[in-house]
Amino acid sequence: MPAKKYIVTLTNEERQELLALTGAGKLSARKMKRAQILLKADENWKDKDIIAALNTSRSTVERIRKRYVEGGLDKAL
């Protein structure tokens, strides 16, 4: 299996922002799922585990990883 092309490494500030947003419950369902994907990817979860835990698709996980790496947190959400 090839190495991951898009590795999510959140800064402490980004992680705190995502935790605050997900904890407050003030995000749309779509943004909540994106935030959860980023948090789990940052914790080195495998894509298959993220997919199972969040009931999402591989393409969604890959797309969110790519958006974060190429455009940052705002672009990924």
Regions found by a protein language model. Give the residues of each.
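Short, basic alpha-helical/linker "hinge" immediately adjacent to a nucleic-acid-recognition surface
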Residues: 1-77
